[in-house]
């Protein structure tokens, strides 16, 4: 179980998270949601120990950092680096000392199987610079899968990709959760959260709500977090988990300490 207790984080002289407490049970599929600048990615990076808490504690239960796989935002990765898909996957997953040493047979089989899972079969030798945005994101998922981690942390896994790729990769996430893995994802698209994530954590610097997604995404919680609707009924649509693809939500304001 992941336990966050009285977590406060100051980032660039701003308070990014203010006295957050929540728990994530083993095997949960959880979305972290909130407006831009709410502290979603900050919370994920604290779980990854990339950012240290100013005050408070984070415990990973029985697991160590070796049991965690992290999927970063794809926009933070240089796609022009001269490296093949299989080299990129193995370097990130196994921290190889050299991109170009020969693969073991076991490594090659794991890479090939992961690429089949994300529908990139046969693309091991392709340069990453040749991949489309959706293919690049599928490759990042493959790198995450071969780590065999028990806890998966994903930062905006569906940003800037098409709807079909999002659906395909959501199926991969659900498969991981069905295998007993704990999956925590920072999410921007509330319609996907409403459709696929049983649990959610809503933050707006402070914790607004956490628990069952249908309860967390109630209109008064979203409004308290700083969301506003283009159309008044959209909050009710999310709450009812009905026709979520038609829901339009936008943050009330922009911040910069995410």
Model-identified regions with their sequence ranges:
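Helix-to-loop junction immediately C-terminal to a conserved catalytic motif
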Residues: 48
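Conserved ABC ATPase "signature" region
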Residues: 105-123
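Conserved ABC ATPase signature
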Residues: 127-131, 135
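Catalytic Walker B motif of ABC-type/P-loop ATPase nucleotide-binding domains
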Residues: 152-156
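H-loop/switch region of ABC-family ATPase nucleotide-binding domains
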Residues: 187-188
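H-loop (His-switch) and adjacent beta-strand-loop-beta switch element
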Residues: 200-212
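ABC ATPase nucleotide-binding domains
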Residues: 214-258
């Amino acid at each position: 179980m992941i336990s966050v207790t009285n977590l406060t984080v100051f980032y660039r002289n701003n308070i990014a998270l203010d006295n957050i407490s929540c728990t994530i049970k083993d095997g949960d599929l959880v979305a972290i949601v909130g407006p831009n600048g709410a502290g979603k990615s900050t919370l994920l990076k604290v779980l990854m120990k990339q950012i240290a808490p100013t005050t408070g504690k984070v415990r990973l239960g029985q697991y160590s950092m070796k049991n965690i796989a992290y999927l970063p935002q794809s926009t933070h990765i240089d796609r022009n680096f001269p490296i093949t898909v299989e080299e990129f996957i193995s370097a990130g997953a196994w921290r190889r000392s050299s991109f170009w040493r020969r693969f073991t047979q076991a490594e090659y089989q794991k890479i090939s199987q992961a690429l089949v899972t994300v529908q990139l079969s046969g693309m091991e030798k392709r340069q990453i610079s040749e991949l489309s945005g959706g293919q690049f994101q599928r490759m990042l998922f493959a790198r995450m899968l071969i780590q065999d981690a028990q806890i998966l942390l994903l930062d905006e896994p569906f940003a800037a990709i098409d709807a079909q790729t999002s659906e395909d990769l959501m199926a991969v996430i659900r498969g991981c959760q069905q295998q007993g893995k704990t999956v925590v994802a920072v999410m921007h698209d509330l319609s996907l959260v409403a459709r696929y994530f049983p649990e959610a954590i809503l933050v707006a610097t402070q914790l607004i709500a956490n628990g069952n997604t249908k309860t967390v995404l109630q209109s008064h919680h979203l409004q308290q977090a700083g969301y506003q609707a283009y159309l008044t009924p959209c909050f009710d649509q999310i709450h009812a988990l009905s026709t979520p693809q038609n829901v339009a939500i936008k943050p009330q304001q922009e911040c910069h300490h995410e």
